[in-house]
Amino acid sequence: MRQKSVRIAVFEQAAEIYYMDILETIKEQVTANPILLYMKGSPEQPQCGFSSQVSQALMACGEKFAYIDILSNPEIRANLPQYSDWPTFPQLFVAGELVGGCDIIMEMYNSGELLPIVKSATSE
């Protein structure tokens, strides 16, 4: 019985370390890229309508941006909502801060608020 509980404790500790590693990876991605979009698919081949809308809005701003395909990165997909405290995808980070998801980004794009935020992130 004792050995079983030790194994469980070791497994739980390993799971905690793995979880922390994923969160650290996300943090590094967010801080290393002035504009980062977590999306389904790629800007050239989005795999959902929301990701398509946001990537098109970003491309219309005329600045380069990084993206991560969460469909190809299941660990990121599973843990990003805990990191960002945002439950849905896509998620746009600018200058290390979460800007929002599709509805917010499209509202900002249509009102002209997105362009200056994107431009300021690339000029820093």
Sequence positions of predicted segments:
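Acidic beta-strand-to-loop metal/phosphate-binding motif
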Residues: 38, 91-95
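Thiol/disulfide oxidoreductase modules built on the thioredoxin-like
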Residues: 82-88
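Short, Lys/Arg-enriched N-terminal segments with co-localized hydrophobic residues
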Residues: 3-19
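Eukaryotic intrinsically disordered and solvent-exposed regulatory patches
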Residues: 23-24
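Non-catalytic, surface beta->alpha helical segment in thiol-disulfide oxidoreductase systems
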Residues: 94-123
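Thiol-based oxidoreductase modules, predominantly thioredoxin-like and allied folds used
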Residues: 59-77
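Local sequence-structure signature of Cys/Sec-based thiol-disulfide redox active-site neighborhoods
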Residues: 28-64
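Short secondary-structure boundary/capping segments
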Residues: 27-28, 106
